[in-house]
Each structure stands twice: as C-alpha cells, then as structure tokens.
Regions:
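Hydrophobic/aromatic beta-strand patches that form the interior of the parallel beta-sheet core
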Residues: 1-5, 32-35, 104, 130, ...
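Active-site-proximal region of nucleotide-activated glycan assembly enzymes
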Residues: 1-63
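Short, aromatic/basic amphipathic alpha-helical patches
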Residues: 15-23, 93-94, 114-123, 183-185
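Active-site donor-nucleotide binding/catalytic segment of nucleotide-sugar enzymes
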Residues: 36-112
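C-terminal amphipathic helix plus adjacent low-complexity
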Residues: 46-47, 68-69, 192-248
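Catalytic donor nucleotide-activated moiety binding site of glycosyltransferases and closely related
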Residues: 98-133
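A donor-sugar binding/catalytic signature common to diverse glycosyltransferases
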Residues: 134-183
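Nucleotide-sugar donor-binding patch of glycosyltransferase catalytic domains
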Residues: 167-207
Length: 248
C-alpha cells in the first residue's frame, strides 16, 4: 500500500479525487490522499499539542500578555503576517473605530508594509504598532491564540487561524493570472457561502480594494460563526483520524 499525501486544497475537485486508486503493478496500489475542508476530503492536521496550546493561552491570558511584553490594556489586539500590500484603508478603518488598538507585525516583509504610517514612537493616532522578532512556530501559535484578530498569510497559519475560532483574514500567496483568487473563492464557498459581505472582505483584502467596515463592525458575530466552523472542522476534518481509518 502506498499513500501519496498531496497539497491542501479547498477546491471542489478534491472530493472526487481524494482516495483515488492508482495501480502500480503487481499487488501494489497507490492512493491519493488530499487534505481539504470537506467531510469527503482528507481533512486538515488537528494536532493535540496545538489545541492544548490554544486552550492554555486562552485560560491564562494575563500571563501570556506579559510573555509578549503587552503591559497596557487595549480594546483590540491584532496580529499581522502578510505579503506585500497596501494597508491604507485598513488603518483608516481602525482610526474610525476610535479604539485603542495594538498591531503586532510579524516578518520583515509585513513590517515594511507599515513603515510609512508610523512615527518614531510607533503610533498612528490611537493605533500602536510593534515589530516582533522572529520566533518559533510554537510561540507564533501562542500569539495567534492571544490576539483578538489575526491577519495571516500562507497555508499553515491559515489553518491555525481556522482552528482558533477567531476573526481572521487570509492573505493567500499571489499567483499569475489571479489563480490564487480562484483558490480563495473555493475556500469562501465552503467557509461563508451565505455571507456576501464577509466573502467580499476576503477577496478585496487580496486585490488591494480593501473595505473593512463590515468586518470590524461585526467582529462578535464573525467570532461566533468562526467558533462554530472550528467545531465543524474538529468534528469532521481530522486528517490523522481519516488516514488511520483508511489504513485500517
């Protein structure tokens, strides 16, 4: 038995091709195991260490705030991990909220996106930005669990954001001919098919036509929805369980 573990995809074709059989000759068979977000797909990795870490951070919030040197009270703490993009409208929307906001900027590329906005004290109106150094992925997971909102990039942090049940936006890796937008739309059809405003927020975030008003006005509603979606993933999309059950 040979199992070919493929790349993650939320596109519809995954349901048809997951566990397709390929004959290699003799008695050897190969199966394509494709991770995804539907019950018919291979699911996503739900490692116990991450879920335990998530619960630990949420149960000991004050301790972890100190671990990340967050010693003031903020109305909103947001992590930002992005590719190159313009954040003009993002910051204008945060300004209009009239709340005390902390932005935690990860990676040099992300930090360069924000250089023009902040003075020497790292303040932009009531918004404070902090450049975070490189740290381990375990610590990044703790940070995601600590923040109220997470702006993530790539697939690993995207899956983690899904499993936290918190408001998030995904900056998908840009590809030629807008192939990445097709992939993003496939995800959104599974994630929030009936929420036009949220779908448009995700898409606009990835084409620099940002409009964040709906997102920040409805954080509580989005959080509740994401918690329910997280429960669905844990219940129906556990890659390890699916793999073990298939082998058995």
């Amino acid at each position: 038995l040979m199992i070919n573990l493929e790349y993650f995809s939320s596109e519809d074709w995954v349901d048809d091709f997951h566990l397709q059989e390929s004959f290699l000759g003799g008695n050897l068979k190969k199966y394509f195991f494709i991770p995804g977000l539907s019950e018919k797909s291979g699911g996503i990795i739900l490692d116990k260490e991450f879920l335990d870490r998530k619960n630990k951070v949420q149960e000991n919030r004050e301790y972890y705030l100190k671990q990340f040197n967050i010693n003031e009270n903020y109305d909103l703490i947001i992590s930002v991990f992005s590719y190159e993009k313009n954040f003009d409208n993002f910051l204008k929307t945060l300004q209009k909220l009239d709340k005390k906001v902390l932005l935690l900027l990860l990676s040099e590329k992300t930090q360069k996106n924000f250089i023009k906005y902040f003075d020497n004290n790292n303040y932009y109106d009531k918004i404070k930005a902090v450049k975070l150094p490189f740290f381990t992925y375990d610590k990044y997971e703790e940070l995601l669990a600590l923040c109220d909102v997470n702006l993530v990039r790539g697939e690993d942090s995207f899956v983690r954001a899904l499993l936290l049940g918190k408001p998030f936006l995904w900056h998908i890796y840009p590809q030629d001919e807008n192939t990445h937008i097709i992939k993003l739309e496939s995800f959104l059809e599974k994630y929030c098919l009936n929420n036009k405003e949220l779908r448009e927020t995700f898409i606009n975030y990835n084409i620099n036509k940002d409009y964040f008003s709906y997102f920040f006005k409805n954080l509580d509603e989005i959080k509740k929805y994401n918690e329910e979606y997280c429960d669905y993933l844990i219940e129906n999309c556990n890659l390890i369980d699916k793999l073990i059950n298939f082998i058995e």
